[in-house]
Amino acid sequence: MNPTKRNSHAIVEFVDVLLRDGAVIQADAIVTVAGVPLLGISLRAAIAGMTTMTEYGIFDGWDADHRRRNAQP
């Protein structure tokens, strides 16, 4: 039995879902040397299309300012 769905479009479908629905990545790390904590890292990243970002209230001000600046002649 051969598969009926081809995997050639998998990356396109992944990007489509990522832009439509978005994703949030959060990571925390502590760098220690000899048991002594030296550096703390906290990372939060969101990736999505601008439509999704503005629906969730992310980049509202930036999007409005950017559109206003680009609309001026």
From Swiss-Prot:
Source organism, top-level taxon: Archaea
Keyword tRNA-binding: no
Coiled-coil regions listed: none
InterPro entries: Gas-vesicle_GvpA-like, GvpA, GvpA-like_CS
Main location: other
Annotated compartments: Gas vesicle
Key words, A-Z: Gas vesicle, Plasmid
Induction: In PHH4 (a deletion of the p-vac locus) transcribed in all growth phases, maximal expression in mid-stationary phase. An unstable 6kb transcript able to cover gvpD-gvpE-gvpF-gvpG-gvpH-gvpI-gvpJ-gvpK-gvpL-gvpM is detected, as well as smaller transcripts. Gas vesicles appear earlier when grown in static culture, possibly due to O(2)-limitation.
One GO MF term attached to the UniProt entry: structural molecule activity
A GO cellular-component term linked to this record: gas vesicle
Similarity-based family: Belongs to the gas vesicle GvpA family.
PANTHER family per the UniProt record, alphabetical: GAS VESICLE PROTEIN A1, GAS VESICLE STRUCTURAL PROTEIN 2-RELATED
Physiological role: Proteins GvpF to GvpM might be involved in nucleating gas vesicle formation. A minor component of the gas vesicle. Gas vesicles are hollow, gas filled proteinaceous nanostructures found in several microbial planktonic microorganisms. They allow positioning of halobacteria at the optimal depth for growth in the poorly aerated, shallow brine pools of their habitat.
NCBIfam families in alphabetical order: halo_gas_GvpM
Other observations noted: Encoded in a 14-gene locus called c-vac which produces cylindrical gas vesicles only in the stationary growth phase.
Subunit text: GvpF to GvpM interact with each other in vitro, and may form multi-subunit complex(es). Might interact with GvpA.
Protein name: Gas vesicle protein M2
Source species taxonomy: Archaea, Methanobacteriati, Methanobacteriota, Stenosarchaea group, Halobacteria
